[in-house]
Amino acid sequence: MRKWILTWILPSLLYRSCFHIICLVGTISLACNDMTPEQMATNVNCSSPERHTRSYDYMEGGDIRVRRLFCRTQWYLRIDKRGKVKGTQEMKNNYNIMEIRTVAVGIVAIKGVESEYYLAMNKEGKLYAKKECNEDCNFKELILENHYNTYASAKWTHSGGEMFVALNQKGVPVRGKKTKKEQKTAHFLPMAIT
């Protein structure tokens, strides 16, 4: 008779102890849940911007990146001291260094660091430069699957379609009316300054 009682009590004790351990672990995890997701990510060290080469944090606003915009047609976007927008193949040209400032989620303003002119697009889709930033200077930045970025006017469209910043095979700006997201003339790679 005693054998039967011991074998009956033993599983009961095991289940109770497992239940208490589960409750204890659950309480500890709830106590640690006071941290924000950013704090938890920092503790785990898997979501810091240093670890990701293509961080999307800049799309949230206020961030400034200094880059050279290299078009898939092998030209760097350039804004010279007179405000002329065109392409250059000289990598070490100071007029192709751009300041990309986030003004809203997914919206950026592009400014030539040396020339201090902002890139702008008018309603006909012509690229030009302005000393003062306004709505013509706002572009929707989109990261494509091929890792290139496109910059479409945030203000202007043509027949319901977006108008993109683009450089042709000769480094000449293409009017936004003639551009599409899929064209390589509108694909830019933001390159870090070395």
UniProtKB/Swiss-Prot annotation:
The record's SMART domains line, in alphabetical order, gives: FGF
Q: Which GO terms describe its biological process?
A: positive regulation of cell division
Location in or out of the cell: Secreted
Task: Show the GO MF annotations.
Answer: growth factor activity; heparin binding
Question: According to its UniProt record, where is this protein mainly located?
Answer: secreted
Pfam families linked to this entry: FGF
**What PROSITE patterns does its record include?**
HBGF_FGF
Q: Which InterPro entries match?
A: Fibroblast_GF_fam, IL1/FGF
Q: Which residues are glycosylated?
A: N45
Q: Which UniProt keywords apply?
A: Glycoprotein, Growth factor, Heparin-binding, Mitogen, Secreted, Signal
| Lineage: superkingdom | Eukaryota
| UniProt family annotation | Belongs to the heparin-binding growth factors family.
- Give a short account of what the protein does: Plays an important role in the regulation of embryonic development, cell proliferation and cell differentiation. Required for normal branching morphogenesis. Growth factor active on keratinocytes. Possible major paracrine effector of normal epithelial cell proliferation.
Oligomeric state and partners?
Interacts with FGFBP1. Interacts with FGFR2. Affinity between fibroblast growth factors (FGFs) and their receptors is increased by heparan sulfate glycosaminoglycans that function as coreceptors.
**Protein name (Swiss-Prot/TrEMBL):** Fibroblast growth factor 7
Give the originating organism: Cervus elaphus
Q: Could you tell me the gene encoding this protein?
A: FGF7
